[in-house]
From Swiss-Prot:
NCBIfam families: cbiD. The keyword Ribonucleoprotein does not apply. GO terms for molecular function: cobalt-precorrin-5B C1-methyltransferase activity. This is Cobalt-precorrin-5B C(1)-methyltransferase. It catalyses: Co-precorrin-5B + S-adenosyl-L-methionine = Co-precorrin-6A + S-adenosyl-L-homocysteine. InterPro entries: CbiD, CbiD_sf. Its EC number is 2.1.1.195. It comes from Methanococcus maripaludis (strain C5 / ATCC BAA-1333). Belongs to the CbiD family. One of its GO terms (biological process) is anaerobic cobalamin biosynthetic process. It is an enzyme of class 2 (transferase). Keywords: Cobalamin biosynthesis, Methyltransferase, S-adenosyl-L-methionine, Transferase.
Amino acid sequence: MNKIDFRLEKTFGYTTGACAAAGSYSALYFLKNNKKLDFVEILNLKGDSLIIPIKNIEKQGNTAISTVEKFSGEDIDITNGMDIKIKVTLENMDNNCSKSSNVKIIGGTGVGFITKSGLQVKPGKPAINPKPREMIETNLKSLLKDNECVTVKISVPNGDEIAKKTLNPKLGIIGGISILGTTGIVRPMSNDAYKESLAPQIDVALANNFKNLIFVPGNIGTKHAKILLNAEEDQIIEVSNFWDHMLDKAKEKGVKDITVFGHAGKIVKLAGGIFDTHSRVADARNEILCAYTSLATQDVKILQKILQSNTTEDIVEILIEKGILTEVFEKVSKRVVERLSLRWEGINFSCIIIDMEGNILGKYV
């Protein structure tokens, strides 16, 4: 069993789920012992000990409200520094408690509401994932007597505004953020959490019976896929830079048909076997386009211009002037399909490459 003291720890952070578990524990402890805690020590589901600071706590009658400030460590995200408020009401079992459990967990203002199938939580329920629920229940039950029960209400001030900057609206989670976290720990400087937040898009698409999924890098692809392909929101999967991760997930979930669609600046990299398209990982756009242009022309001056270009848009203009734009990008599109088909066997791929305005530069379908 490991122990992380977040009063001292600056590298690791703690999840929204850990905030909710810590806040609910401190509130119930206050109700039971009439003592305010500046921090609590709770267990995650692996048995690790997490020491989490409590920002504020108040009590009135059989109800206490605890506030925990979300801390993301070095892996700063949109939720870092936000307050999570947990209201705990303590009652006897013969009052308004469920017979099946002595811990009832509900969502308040700023916690999202599920509207689409395919996620870990069913439609009509608050966006509080199963693992955080289990962590809350496990820690509270250590304080409860057999004849006692609690209602835990989780709220996030400004959660609805914060959620607009996340994938929640696309996933059909409306009105607030999600309470997440398997271990309760946010690992530093990794993309793991963000990658995992992208994967549920595939579940939503499959739950809505889409057979062909459209994988796009981001907003530009999403916007133009709706126009050019008449695609529906839930059919479009935003992968960010993580093509390898998302295609692994797609194969794992049984997806058979994928259209790769998006701006040339990102899609071209796939032709070179670059499946994490972030610029800090690799670029090579100019080199890749130069190689495929050389199959259409041996004009050395054109090839040199391409290598020295600052943007993909500049290269597009060069190819238009030379009259070989479509030829080059159709070759690139074909190579994208070949690359992906070799790595992710069993999936039928097609590829459409566009510019910023949504004009099709090349395709292989």
